[in-house]
Amino acid sequence: MAMEGYWRFLALLGSALLVGFLSVIFALVWVLHYREGLGWDGSALEFNWHPVLMVTGFVFIQGIAIIVYRLPWTWKCSKLLMKSIHAGLNAVAAILAIISVVAVFENHNVNNIANMYSLHSWVGLIAVICYLLQLLSGFSVFLLPWAPLSLRAFLMPIHVYSGIVIFGTVIATALMGLTEKLIFSLRDPAYSTFPPEGVFVNTLGLLILVFGALIFWIVTRPQWKRPKEPNSTILHPNGGTEQGARGSMPAYSGNNMDKSDSELNSEVAARKRNLALDEAGQRSTM
């Protein structure tokens, strides 16, 4: 199936991948060139894992996981395969985020630095917890087969909305964290004097912001949504199911030969309205 605005989508996707990759490279260059490298000994070198893993996992990989359903060359793949890829990318992002949080707490505890006093730490920990809950609920409800269809229909809009909110929160938290680190670390020369490290990390923040904006734009364009699979089951919040229009119409016609034309026309119209309304809840925005 052809995608509307295919080349525009490719341009935005390529831009997002480029900016996201540059964000990861900038984070690595920052800690390796300006912050003396990486380690796992409780020192500042261990803390340096925090920005690298957060930018790599919680920003870049999570962003790719959000838009993976929208890649048109995957539309011929089964929905189960795409769900597995989506869940796998989010699981990798979650693991990297957890390791980065552990690095911060270990560094603070070894050096007797207080934990969880800044807004960055509050919002960041909330984002990690919500992300883990989102991952667990998504795996349990949408990937495993035993969840009732009515539960999936009810949770799908919540899953989509909360995923976008969490990603936006992560972007904001990353920007707060970069600024906080520069204020604490840059003393001579001070951050206010535009030192090279300050300018470099500010640029990293802009890259993260642009990456987030591109992901938001891609994931909110309805014309780039993964098309509904033929003969797929549409979920009703009341627990019922409806087959895709092509697969259901012949059976419908055969079972209603005794009905009048007016009754058939009214039921067909009602069914089309229900399909249009329910399809929004069935297909993930992502």
Swiss-Prot record:
EC number: 7.2.1.3
GO cellular component: apical plasma membrane; brush border membrane; extracellular exosome; lysosomal membrane; membrane; plasma membrane
Effect the entry attributes to changing H108A: Loss of transmembrane ascorbate ferrireductase activity
Binding site for heme b 1: H50, N115, M116, Y117, S118, H120, E180
Modified-residue entries (Phosphothreonine), positions: T285
Extracellular face of the membrane: 33-47, 106-118, 180-197
UniProt region (Disordered), positions on chain: 229-268
Induction remarks: By iron deficiency (at protein level).
GO terms for MF: identical protein binding; metal ion binding; oxidoreductase activity; oxidoreductase activity, acting on metal ions; transmembrane ascorbate ferrireductase activity; transmembrane monodehydroascorbate reductase activity
Source organism: Homo sapiens
Protein name: Plasma membrane ascorbate-dependent reductase CYBRD1
Cofactor binding mode and count: Binds 2 heme b groups non-covalently.
Gene giving rise to this polypeptide: CYBRD1
Residue list for modification Phosphoserine: S232
Cofactor: heme b
GO BP terms, alphabetized: ascorbate homeostasis; intracellular iron ion homeostasis; multicellular organismal-level iron ion homeostasis; reductive iron assimilation; response to iron ion
